[in-house]
Amino acid sequence: MSRFDESVNIYSDGHLLQVEYAQEAVRKGSTVGLRTKECVVLGVEKRAIDSLQIERTSRKIKKIDQHMAMTFAGLTADARVLVSRAQVEAQSHRLNFDRPASVEYITRYLARLKQTYTQSVARRPFGVSCLIGGFDEDGRPRLFQTDPSGIYYEWSANTTGRLGQTVNEYLEKNTAAISRTPDAASAMKHVVRALFTATSLDPASIELAVLRYWQPIEMVKPETLEYLLGVIKQEAVEEALTKAP
């Protein structure tokens, strides 16, 4: 890497190399988010933790406010900075306006912060892609994704990180079924099935959270994940038998 690659204002062919390096860091994990009429489900691939490690300190789904959560793919240390900044901004909004911040407001705040770091001297872009899900005051479910470059989009279902294209193929292939998802259980199954395409079928490697309107964020228990994985295994066997000549 030449010294020009490290500069924030020298580039060629429209490529910001530092941003592209940050995009590569995002490939260190996989996340999936799905929005239905009743809930928002966030799922993330995680490494198995040591038996002596406290589980809550390694979680990759973080609460931003009572009605909002965020998960991420990329550098965990960078993500913790963004989570902390988002939490402070959400609480500041409550104190100043006596109402919760909208999901898009926090997403815009994070996107603006990320974009600022692509133009700052002696700083590097955040190597994190975030999925932010939650509910607005009117009960509308929202799901947003931000990139290291600072751009953001809203989605009904999306994935970021490692094998993102493979997971997206599953989501696009099952768009009709996902759009008709009636409840949280069905939504959770779709998210776990999507993560299954990117990771081993093991409850210890998956973290799942469900957000509902005016309800506490639910972190899905390992027993529930075990049950969902059992259902998915059975469905996979049935599909294989159906396709067999």
Swiss-Prot record:
Q: What is its main location?
A: cytoplasm
Would you identify the family this protein belongs to, as annotated? Belongs to the peptidase T1A family.
Q: In which tissues has expression of this protein been reported? A: Testis specific.
Zinc keyword on record: no
- A Pfam family the protein falls into: Proteasome
What domain of life does the native source organism fall in?
Answer: Eukaryota
Gene Ontology cellular component terms for the protein in this record: cytoplasm; nucleus; proteasome core complex, alpha-subunit complex
Q: What does this protein do?
A: The proteasome is a multicatalytic proteinase complex which is characterized by its ability to cleave peptides with Arg, Phe, Tyr, Leu, and Glu adjacent to the leaving group at neutral or slightly basic pH. The proteasome has an ATP-dependent proteolytic activity.
Q: How does it assemble?
A: The 26S proteasome consists of a 20S proteasome core and two 19S regulatory subunits. The 20S proteasome core is composed of 28 subunits that are arranged in four stacked rings, resulting in a barrel-shaped structure. The two end rings are each formed by seven alpha subunits, and the two central rings are each formed by seven beta subunits. The catalytic chamber with the active sites is on the inside of the barrel.
SUPFAM superfamilies in the cross-refs: N-terminal nucleophile aminohydrolases (Ntn hydrolases) (SSF56235)
Q: Give the GO biological process terms.
A: ubiquitin-dependent protein catabolic process
Record carries keyword Cytoplasm:
yes
Alphabetically list the UniProt keywords.
Answer: Cytoplasm, Nucleus, Proteasome
Q: What gene is this protein a product of? A: Pros28.1B
Q: In which compartments does the protein localize? A: Cytoplasm; Nucleus
Report what the protein is called.
Proteasome subunit alpha type-7-1B
* PROSITE patterns to which the protein is assigned, alphabetical: PROTEASOME_ALPHA_1 (PS00388), PROTEASOME_ALPHA_2 (PS51475)
